[in-house]
Every structure is written in structure tokens, then in C-alpha cells.
Amino acid sequence: MGFIYDWSEERLEIQSIADDILSKFVPSHVNIFYCFGGIVLTAFIFQGASGFALTIYYRPTVVEAFSSIQLILYHVNLGWFIRSIHRWSSGCMVLVLILHISRVYLTGGFKKPRELTWISGVILAVVTVSFGVTGYSLPWDQIGYWACKIVTAVPEALDDLLPGAGKLLVLTLRGGFSVGQTTLTRLYSIHTFVLPLVTLVLLIVHFSLLRKQGISGPL
């Protein structure tokens, strides 16, 4: 082990990186309310782990989606537990995210020079809501189907500003004029690939900015 550490240290300077991370100054005014961002990240990790486990058995087809959820809940070992983690951690993530945004706003954490940190955080909030919107329809039950139909019709309101743009966006989301298999496939792809990738990139940006600028001071 010593040889591996020495070899890695010589090339990567691991110790200096660890010292920089562990020796970061934490302002004295920081309290429990500054932990909301970390809780959101923890919930996202739970979401990713439980979501990956669910993809093993979930089938993104209009015929088998609902039955695959029933399989997970009632026949797969600990399937009900994994889905419960995914479901409840999503609610926790949204709730704590609201608290996190409120704390940052009320303490002035969005002010100069932290505007970019705030902007990246707001975009992350939008992505988080998008996770909920796309994931809600994946079971493809009655609630999921009608929620999908309503949500995918919302962009049509853009036609008032840009004629034709809203309808084009609706067709893109649905993959046609009606909600069906193509819609479910696109929602599944967005939920399991596009949004996680975007989130990871934004998290790197968000934490890099936070690391560079530090925690905002008290009011």
C-alpha cells in the first residue's frame, strides 16, 4: 500500500489536494441552516443509486411500464424499499432545495461576487423540477398518463410569443400529435440520461464556484 501511495503522490500530489480540501476555512457564522445544500446533494446521490437499481427491472413501454412497477413493488427482493427510497428522497430533495434557496436569498448569498453561483443554483433547481415532471409519468398509470398529457401541452402557450414555437416543442416532447410510446421513451431518456448528465455538469460548476468564492458572510 505504501508503494501505491508513494507512486500516486509523486504523480498526482494527492496529499496537497487533501490538505486543501480539509483545511478550508469555515466562517464562524455558519450554522445548521447552511447544511441544506449538502442535504440536497445527499438526496440526489440516493436518487441516483435507487434510480439505477430501478432501471434493472423497469421496462419503458406503454404495455409493460405499469406491470414492471408492480413487479418491483411486490416480487423483487427489497424492490418496495428501493422504490420508496427513490420516491421519498425525491420529495425530500425538492423540499430541502426550497429551504436552501430561501436561506441563500434571505442571507444575500446571491449578491456580488456570487452571481454565477446563484445562477447555476437556480438552473439546478429547474433541472430538479424537471426530474419530477419526467419521472412522474414513468409508471404510466392513469395519473402518470394524464400528467404527461397536461405537462407536454404546456409549451403550446409559447405560440403567443413565438407563433409555431410552442406547437413544435409539444411535437418534439411527444414525438407526435398524441401521447404514446414515443413520448414515454423520450421522457425515460431525459429522466435517466439527459438530466443526470446536466446535473453533474452543473454540480461541478456550482461547487467549484462555491469553493473559489467561499460561503457568503452574515447579513
Curated annotation (Swiss-Prot):
Its cofactor is heme b; heme c. One of its GO terms (biological process) is photosynthesis. The chain crosses the membrane at residues 32-52, 90-110, 116-136, 190-210. Keywords: Chloroplast, Electron transport, Heme, Iron, Membrane, Metal-binding, Photosynthesis, Plastid, Thylakoid, Transmembrane, Transmembrane helix, Transport. Heme b 1 binds at residues 100, 206. The keyword Chloroplast applies. It is found in: Plastid, Chloroplast thylakoid membrane. One of its GO terms (molecular function) is oxidoreductase activity. It holds the Pfam family Cytochrome_B. It is a multi-pass membrane protein. Heme b 2 binds at residues 86, 191. Its main location: plastid. Heme c binds at residue 35. Binds 2 heme b groups non-covalently with two histidine residues as axial ligands. One of its GO terms (cellular component) is chloroplast thylakoid membrane. It comes from the Eukaryota. HAMAP family: Cytb6_f_cytb6 (MF_00633). PANTHER family: CYTOCHROME B. Component of the cytochrome b6-f complex, which mediates electron transfer between photosystem II (PSII) and photosystem I (PSI), cyclic electron flow around PSI, and state transitions. The 4 large subunits of the cytochrome b6-f complex are cytochrome b6, subunit IV (17 kDa polypeptide, PetD), cytochrome f and the Rieske protein, while the 4 small subunits are PetG, PetL, PetM and PetN. The complex functions as a dimer. Heme 1 (or BH or b566) is high-potential and absorbs at about 566 nm, and heme 2 (or BL or b562) is low-potential and absorbs at about 562 nm. Belongs to the cytochrome b family. PetB subfamily. This is Cytochrome b6. It comes from Heterocapsa triquetra (Dinoflagellate). The gene is petB.
